[in-house]
């Protein structure tokens, strides 16, 4: 039986005079929470390794020949001769190992790593990652990873059923990689620094520059910051300032942040996130639900006894359609609280609200950017 649910929404847009609403209370954040130093970005590392100690949930070596090749190469590097036929071990798996190398990381510090199955292993639970070198985009080795895996999901299997929850072919090793090489950094020798906003916005960029300049005038007598665009703010180091101390003082300054109004919709999960500055002009929404139920009831037709006929299957389909009465509702949202209350009053589920928001955007009444994921 299949059930098809169709949400119909008809929108009528009506222009209204400008509604004067009190401005929302401004949010203040530290600069370190909304911006990062351009010279202090992360770098991605990647490596290929083996996970051992699995309880029969590893790669089947016939389907994943690269796993057996890697296992033999590892044993040979350890001085163990591997000759003979093909191995039937199921407690080993080939994996890709990834990590982020944080800025200013020094040799000896540790970072987390993510391990993902490369072959046909069904679960990495209980496994251990064997020493794996992690390289950067330049091909140089910057870290070495090893350790016990932590898997969030689980899988149980019997003769006639299998139960899986979460992802069992991906795992993490907290603090599993040791930094072996330091990235070259010119931070100490820099004269100009660049702050990059994590959420680009012209208003926020100007406010960051103003706050930094107000601090610099009081401390050094001259402004030192200049906004370049919606994302970058250039900061010039005063001659008498220590760069590390200057950045420590700047990143703790508070700024009034501002972001564009957005509505983010994830149609797969039915998640709707509405920003605080989203506004909806008055619209009339007519909505109704049409449910189509399709039922398949195949019938088996047996031949007559002692005849040469064959058993046949005759398909039989029953279709039933049900439609609820359509209603007309007025939706208007001069602020977030009123908007959410208006959408909840309609009484629709998430998929219905998503369809209505898309229609309101098409009608030009949604004063925000609609982001579909």
Curated annotation (Swiss-Prot):
One of its GO terms (cellular component) is bacterial-type flagellum basal body. GO terms for molecular function: structural molecule activity. Keywords: Bacterial flagellum, Periplasm, Signal. Pfam families: FlgI. Residues 1-26 form the signal peptide. InterPro entries: Flag_FlgI. Its main location: periplasm. GO terms for biological process: bacterial-type flagellum-dependent cell motility. It is found in: Periplasm; Bacterial flagellum basal body. Assembles around the rod to form the L-ring and probably protects the motor/basal body from shearing forces during rotation. HAMAP family: FlgI. Belongs to the FlgI family. The basal body constitutes a major portion of the flagellar organelle and consists of four rings (L,P,S, and M) mounted on a central rod. NCBIfam families: PRK05303.1. This is Flagellar P-ring protein. It comes from Agrobacterium fabrum (strain C58 / ATCC 33970) (Agrobacterium tumefaciens (strain C58)).
């Amino acid at each position: 039986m299949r059930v098809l649910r169709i949400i119909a929404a008809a929108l009528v847009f009506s222009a209204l005079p400008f509604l004067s609403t009190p401005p929302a209370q401004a949010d203040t954040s530290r600069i370190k929470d909304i911006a990062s130093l351009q010279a202090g970005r992360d770098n991605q590392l990647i490596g290929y390794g083996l996970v051992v100690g699995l309880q029969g949930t590893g790669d089947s070596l016939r389907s994943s020949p690269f796993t057996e090749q890697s296992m033999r190469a590892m044993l040979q590097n350890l001085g163990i001769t591997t000759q003979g036929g093909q191995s039937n071990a199921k407690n080993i798996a080939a994996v890709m190992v990834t990590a982020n190398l944080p800025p200013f990381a020094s040799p000896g510090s540790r970072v987390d790593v993510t391990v993902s199955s490369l072959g046909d292993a069904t679960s990495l639970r209980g496994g251990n990652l064997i020493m794996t070198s992690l390289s950067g985009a330049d091909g140089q080795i910057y870290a070495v990873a090893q350790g016990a895996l932590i898997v969030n999901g689980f899988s149980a299997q019997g003769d006639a059923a299998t139960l899986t929850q979460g992802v069992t072919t991906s795992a993490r090793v907290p603090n599993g990689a040791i930094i072996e090489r330091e990235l070259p950094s010119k931070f100490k020798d820099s004269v100009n620094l660049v702050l990059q906003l994590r959420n680009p916005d012209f208003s926020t960029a100007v406010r960051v520059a103003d706050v930094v300049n107000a601090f610099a005038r009081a401390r050094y007598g001259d402004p030192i910051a200049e906004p370049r665009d919606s994302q970058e703010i250039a900061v010039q180091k005063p001659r008498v300032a220590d760069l590390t101390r200057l950045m420590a003082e700047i990143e703790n300054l508070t700024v009034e942040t501002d972001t564009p109004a957005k509505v983010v919709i994830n149609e797969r999960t039915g998640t709707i996130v509405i920003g605080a500055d989203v506004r909806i002009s008055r619209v009339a929404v007519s909505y109704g639900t049409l449910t189509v139920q399709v039922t398949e009831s195949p019938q088996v037709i047996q031949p007559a006894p002692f005849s040469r006929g064959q058993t046949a299957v005759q398909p039989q389909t029953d279709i039933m359609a049900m439609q609820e009465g359509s209603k007309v509702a007025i939706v208007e949202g001069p602020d977030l609280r009123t908007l959410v209350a208006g959408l909840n009053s309609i009484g629709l589920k998430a998929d219905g609200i998503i369809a209505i928001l898309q229609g309101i955007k098409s009608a030009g009444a949604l004063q925000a950017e609609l982001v579909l994921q």
